[in-house]
Design a protein with these regions (language model features):
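Ser/Thr-rich, low-complexity intrinsically disordered terminal regions
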Residues: 15-137
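Sec-dependent bacterial lipoprotein signal peptides
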Residues: 1-12
């Protein structure tokens, strides 16, 4: 039995994928989504990738994330926050970014899967869940 569990460890750790090199703020915006349907961003305008920004402060977003077991804040600086979300079963890691736009009074978002092509709407659901939690607080 132990041997079976240990043989699964390499597979489970590879589900995390490598941290992307192309995330962060570039020219005042979050990185564009790839063509694959496993990403949403408030900077995108097409139906598949576009999502509304959050009506909140970055501090409120951070408080919500700290209450989510699957979230791990990786970076928080100067109006930008990067968190990794790990799925419970397969341990897939997705990258979620938040960028404060003080002029517009919103938080721009980008949520993208590291692996695979389709996410079956997981990134959109995640952002909408965060939006709902922000409204409760």
């Amino acid at each position: 039995m132990k041997r079976s569990l240990f043989s699964l460890l390499p597979f489970l750790t590879t589900c995390a994928g490598e941290p992307p090199q192309n995330i962060g703020v570039q020219d005042g915006r979050l990185t564009a989504c790839p063509e694959s349907p496993n990403c949403v961003s408030s900077f995108e305008s097409d139906v598949e990738h576009g999502i509304q920004p959050l009506q909140a402060s970055l501090r409120q977003v951070e408080r919500v994330l700290l209450g989510l077991v699957e979230a791990n804040i990786v970076e928080s600086r100067d109006g930008y926050l990067h968190a990794e979300f790990t799925s419970r079963l397969m341990r897939y890691v997705d990258d979620v970014e938040f960028l404060e736009d003080s002029t517009a009074g919103v938080i721009h978002v980008r949520s993208a899967s590291r692996l695979g092509y389709s996410d079956l709407g997981a990134n959109r659901k995640r952002i909408e869940n965060i939006r709902g939690l922000l409204k409760q607080n």
